[in-house]
């Protein structure tokens, strides 16, 4: 007898062993048709999985997040099947699920074209309609290796060769196509109905640039056409908001081949940068931070002591002078410890919060560079807090308050939080880890925040909290971090005199709110579609005259606004007013002031918003009050 317990607490009793599909059939025909897989004692399995002992079972349908992931995984196999049918001789490699879709890497004699993608997607639809049964089989390792070698799939054979000898290998077949996979998968290809191939890119085998270049085909799959259409519309909107396009359109910045991964900031873009930096500088000072500046080039010996030379050297720019090796700093922490070490520290000095807008360089692969989002030269809003173990909770709590306020002021209302706990390989005592993890969790709970644990994902030197923003398109951007460090202070000789007159090593909290200034500005541009809030806009007001008669009056208003601290300019060209309004609205300038004979006579201005809002006529003084209130509130 086999007892299967369902999520509602009811039991289904069977005389013998039973498959997951048979359990679904025993409940209702509708559920049996809808079921895609099962979660047996917490593990995802196929509908064909045999239940031999008393078990807990959750049936997975396309209404579950796991169901959508299984559909996408199966769609990756559908893609590989279609490619193999259309392009014999192609070798398949790996095809995982990613956020909002999947990809599959292929080795083929020529590059795939956009026309090929259309043909592949059409063949995928045909295979879906064949309603092929998807079957799992388990072979021993040697049989699986020989099978894939015999059919010319040498990449698959390599993957299996890396699997331990005694571990069985699972394969999935649909029609005459067989692939290596752990599963689970949908029961029939007809369950994969809504999908679209998106693009082709290059990818190295096993992610190693020393290996051969493969072709990666990206796709997306959904439960319904409505969901897919919404996603595609979102992508379309994201394309319009691409910070690289808007950066050019709004004359904010550019990059060029002579300085890959490094940004040329134009006057308007640098105004945005300065506004953010000034705001952060004032905010940090108001929260007990002191600002420092540390060298960008440091001797190899310091990087060896910190551990970066051993673990991070391939990402560092190295130079040599007078028979000494140096590295341009990829991060600021070793330099901050040197400032802490300069002079005798007492427990009375703690917590000490050292902040720096630190310029860093990392030797990122050229293929990974992407506008402002992935660069080689960047500035971090970095800070390190040196404190005692007993001060961790208080410092974490204060940092969370600070971070939340900053994000709100930049227009982000939703933050996702993850706590990464101790990994298997780590430094520090169990007691230290217990205290640190408890302090981080307690701080999050005291703030009544929703958060999730990432077990074992902490760094070897301490647990961390990650803060991820959601933008106006629902995309996620991991920006803020708070990282405890039990290792670096000791490695670099940091210490303080405790209350009992003994020397102790401080706890070091690495923390950032924006992350990289460059990346955060890119996120802001896309979040606001280039229409930055008034306080951040490089140009806040443009004054437009209708004819030459008002040119002098328009210039007078411009000067008056500038004297009031408003970033204003005038367009006195002899062009139609409708043309000038359209042009400056495209430049995302928040306020457009129109002056004609009537406004000049009444000593007023007619105010329009960049999105076409009509605020009517008002005095310059009234507008200044309105604008200054908006700037102060950071709206």
Curated annotation (Swiss-Prot):
Instruction: Print the organism lineage.
Output: Bacteria, Pseudomonadati, Pseudomonadota, Betaproteobacteria, Nitrosomonadales
Region annotation (Catalytic) ranges: 242-533
**What are the GO BP annotations of this UniProt entry?**
threonyl-tRNA aminoacylation
Write the record's keywords in alphabetical order, separated by commas.
Aminoacyl-tRNA synthetase, ATP-binding, Cytoplasm, Ligase, Metal-binding, Nucleotide-binding, Protein biosynthesis, RNA-binding, tRNA-binding, Zinc
Q: What SUPFAM superfamilies does the record point to? A: Class II aaRS ABD-related (SSF52954), Class II aaRS and biotin synthetases (SSF55681), TGS-like (SSF81271), ThrRS/AlaRS common domain (SSF55186)
Per the record, the domain of life is Bacteria
Provide a Gene Ontology MF annotation, just one.
threonine-tRNA ligase activity
| Quaternary structure and interacting proteins, as annotated | Homodimer.
InterPro entries recorded for this chain? Answer: aa-tRNA-synt_IIb (IPR002314), aa-tRNA-synth_II (IPR006195), aa-tRNA-synth_II/BPL/LPL (IPR045864), Anticodon-bd (IPR004154), Anticodon-bd_dom_sf (IPR036621), Beta-grasp_dom_sf (IPR012675), TGS (IPR004095), TGS-like (IPR012676)
Q: Which NCBIfam families match?
A: thrS (TIGR00418)
Q: Where would you find this protein in the cell? A: Cytoplasm
EC number(s) stated in the UniProt entry for this protein: 6.1.1.3
What this protein needs as a cofactor is:
Zn(2+)
Q: Which Pfam families match?
A: HGTP_anticodon, TGS, tRNA-synt_2b, tRNA_SAD
Q: What is its main location?
A: cytoplasm
Q: Which family does it belong to?
A: Belongs to the class-II aminoacyl-tRNA synthetase family.
Q: Which residues bind Zn(2+)?
A: 333, 384, 510
Q: According to its UniProt record, which reaction does this protein catalyse?
A: tRNA(Thr) + L-threonine + ATP = L-threonyl-tRNA(Thr) + AMP + diphosphate + H(+)
Task: State its role.
Answer: Catalyzes the attachment of threonine to tRNA(Thr) in a two-step reaction: L-threonine is first activated by ATP to form Thr-AMP and then transferred to the acceptor end of tRNA(Thr). Also edits incorrectly charged L-seryl-tRNA(Thr).
State the organism named in the record.
Answer: Nitrosomonas europaea (strain ATCC 19718 / CIP 103999 / KCTC 2705 / NBRC 14298)
Please provide one cellular component term from the Gene Ontology annotations of this protein.
Answer: cytoplasm
Instruction: Spell out the protein name for this chain.
Output: Threonine--tRNA ligase
